[in-house]
């Protein structure tokens, strides 16, 4: 090869195959420090417990020089082979000293590195670490502080639900109107569902037993319109709902509309005896215990001095014109 170093091109002296041109520009023996000279003084080495290295002799230097020259001469004939051998030896030394090196060697040998199908162990480990780091980060971001429903917070919730109506209240709107920092839509949705079940249990519409949230719910009185909304079947049948429980004055609210019927409607019954649809079906509904005619008669709504029929539910049959 043209790049190979030919030893015959240089002037070689007879003293140990020394090349004089290689020594040009190098310091002389007088300029160099003695091999027996220690860079660390003995007192300093003793103070810091430094073990002095063995001093080198001229024989050691000659031996190292001969080893270097022989490696250069051997490398000129096959530089690629020697470099590959050195790399393999270095890899073997590193692999034998590190744990798990057998699996890495197996992956490297299976890849062959020619067609790019091999997998670099370092890159694979870095990718695994990156994935685990991403999972840990996502797990931290998903953790949220648990919200505790206090009586004050529940009272605010009840006020908002009463304002919207239990049927029309949705978690998103409730959350916006409550305007509480840290309150999420999931918190409101879960609390709203428990609150509706609580209202149904209070009205006897479900057979479910008491829950752990009943103590919190009982801390704030339930607005009457919430009972009306949750109990009303709605619609054209005229069934407004079931009566409000005794804790909120059932007997008084049921007597007030009946008293308004006998007192406020007495003159109207005599004047419109033949044309009053309510009078024609009065016996039927009175015998059935129904008060649905109060809703179908707008004149009666005006004569009701107590104003209770528009805000509280009634019990019993359907519309006055049902038959």
UniProtKB/Swiss-Prot annotation:
GO terms for cellular component: nucleus; transcription regulator complex. The gene is LUX. Pfam families: Myb_DNA-binding (PF00249). GO terms for biological process: circadian rhythm; negative regulation of transcription by RNA polymerase II; positive regulation of circadian rhythm; regulation of circadian rhythm. Gene3D superfamilies: Homeodomain-like. One of its GO terms (molecular function) is DNA-binding transcription factor activity. Keywords: Biological rhythms, DNA-binding, Nucleus, Transcription, Transcription regulation. Interacts with ELF3 and forms a complex with ELF3 and ELF4. The lineage of its organism: Eukaryota, Viridiplantae, Streptophyta, Embryophyta, Tracheophyta. Residues 139-200 bind DNA. This is Transcription factor LUX. Residues 1-25, 53-139, 267-298 are annotated as: Disordered. Transcription factor that is essential for the generation of the circadian clock oscillation. Is necessary for activation of CCA1 and LHY expression. Is coregulated with TOC1 and seems to be repressed by CCA1 and LHY by direct binding of these proteins to the evening element in the LUX promoter. Directly regulates the expression of PRR9, a major component of the morning transcriptional feedback circuit, by binding specific sites on PRR9 promoter. Binds to its own promoter, inducing a negative auto-regulatory feedback loop within the core clock. It is found in: Nucleus. Disruption phenotype: Mutant plant flowering lacks a photoperiodic response. Induction: Circadian oscillation with peaks at subjective dusk. Its main location: nucleus. Signal peptide: none annotated. Residues 65-87 have a biased composition (Low complexity). InterPro entries: Homeodomain-like_sf, LUX/BOA-like, Myb_dom, Myb_dom_plants, SANT/Myb.
């Amino acid at each position: 090869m043209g790049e190979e170093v030919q030893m015959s091109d240089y002037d070689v002296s007879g003293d140990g195959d020394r090349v004089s041109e290689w020594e040009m520009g190098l310091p002389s023996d007088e300029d160099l420090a003695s091999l027996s000279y220690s860079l660390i003084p003995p007192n300093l080495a003793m103070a810091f417990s430094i073990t002095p290295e063995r001093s080198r002799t001229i024989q050691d230097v000659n031996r190292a020089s001969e080893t270097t020259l022989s490696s250069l001469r051997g490398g000129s004939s096959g530089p690629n082979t020697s470099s590959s051998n050195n790399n393999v030896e270095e890899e073997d030394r590193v692999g034998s000293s590190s744990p798990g090196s057998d699996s890495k060697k197996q992956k490297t040998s299976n890849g062959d590195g020619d067609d790019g199908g091999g997998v670099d162990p370092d890159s694979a480990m870095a990718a695994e670490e990156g994935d685990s780091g991403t999972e840990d980060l996502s797990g931290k971001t998903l953790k949220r502080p648990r919200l505790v429903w206090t009586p004050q917070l529940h009272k605010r919730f009840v006020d908002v639900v009463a304002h919207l109506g239990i049927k029309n209240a949705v978690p998103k709107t409730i959350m916006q109107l409550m305007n509480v920092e840290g309150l999420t839509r999931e918190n409101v949705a879960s609390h709203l569902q428990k609150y509706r079940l609580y209202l149904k249990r209070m009205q006897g519409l479900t057979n479910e037993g008491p829950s752990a949230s009943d103590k919190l719910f009982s801390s704030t009185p339930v607005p009457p319109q919430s009972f009306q909304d949750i109990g009303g079947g709605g619609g054209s049948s005229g069934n407004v709902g079931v009566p409000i429980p005794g804790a909120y004055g059932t007997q008084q609210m049921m007597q007030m509309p009946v008293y308004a019927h006998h007192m406020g409607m007495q003159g109207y019954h005599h004047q419109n005896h033949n044309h009053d649809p309510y009078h024609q079906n009065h016996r039927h509904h009175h015998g059935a215990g129904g008060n649905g005619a109060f809703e179908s008669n707008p004149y009666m709504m005006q004569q009701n001095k107590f104003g209770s029929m528009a805000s509280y539910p009634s019990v019993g049959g359907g519309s006055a014109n049902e038959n």
